[in-house]
Amino acid sequence: MIEKSAGGRYRVRVFHRGTQVSMKTFDRKKDAETWEAAQKLSVQVGGWIDPKAGAIALASLIEKFNRERKGAVRDHSWDTDESNLRLHIPMKLARRPISSITTGDLETMFTAMMRTHARATVRRHRESVSALFAFAVRYEIVRENIVTKVKLAKGNGKKAREIAPFSEKERDDLISLIRATKPQHADVIEILALTGVRWGELCSLRVFDLQEKPYPAIMVRESESDGYNPADPKSGKTRRVPLDDRAAEILRARALSKNRNDRLFENARGNKLLAAGLTRSLGWSSIAPGKRVYDLRHTAATIWLQSGIDIATVAAWLGHSNSAITHRTYLHYMKTDSDLSGIARINARAAAKRLEMGVED
């Protein structure tokens, strides 16, 4: 109902089942009627949100978002969102009520960030902001997640880092160098390069994850990134990664003197490996300039594709949620094939190479 005050203003009161659920005052009757109609429609279709709920400042909502999700999501996911929202939300925007924030405000924020950051970094920030607004929708603070309406510009900021896989010769030379100078680390580097597992996934591998039937493989069930407790792999699902002859040989040898639940890889003290300790011990920046340990994963993927293994199979081995990610990342390295035939090709290639070098099995 609309009531005109003695001062000439129009007060709107909206009721639901006999209870006043909303009230607002306007200078013009037309504005009051428009607002009343929108509120009544929201009540009727079940999309009504108390306008007072949207008065919470964005900064306060972020605090609530972080507090409610702590321990309920993966630690790494929580840290990523917390960091993005803390570092990349302008203070001027953080002070405003969430209900006042528009798609234009968000587009301005993302566009400004694009000038100084790689598009992939801005995309991850957008994902964190979207998670925040989705949280606000679930808690009936706002009606919709407006972030979904904001598209990122192509960007002219920092160039995204391209993948830098090792060639087969570079990979083999690197492993030979490490076996000669730091043999305790050689198996780690070689398995990363042969299986394409992520660092955290390698750290979580146990003896019982090594399987022989129906073919040699490892079961990737968990990921234990540095500084975090074990969690599901990035895809959220267990996956089977077939082993070529060399990878199977290395892992069988490592499993021989261990118990079923022991880690396949650990440091000299029998504790979890740390990437920083490994790269420091190896002098990684000197022996592999311009490359990251993560590029060993790209190395495995590109060699698989060059061996004729089809994109869907490579995606499954890498633990990608869909083959579109694999296609986008390794577009220039693709051929075709699948599990057993793929491993047969890799083994045949390795055997031919050994024969060329005069090395017998």
Where are these regions (language model features)?
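Short, Arg/Lys-rich segments that mark the N-terminal edge of DNA/RNA- and chromatin-recognition modules
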Residues: M1-D27
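Basic, Lys/Arg- and aromatic-enriched nucleic-acid-binding interface segment
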Residues: G8, R123-E127, R138, V142-L205, ...
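Catalytic-site neighborhood detector that most strongly recognizes the C-terminal catalytic loop/helix
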Residues: R28, E224, A248, L318-I343
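Short, polar N-cap/turn motifs at the start of nucleic acid-interacting alpha helices
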Residues: D209-A217, I309-T329
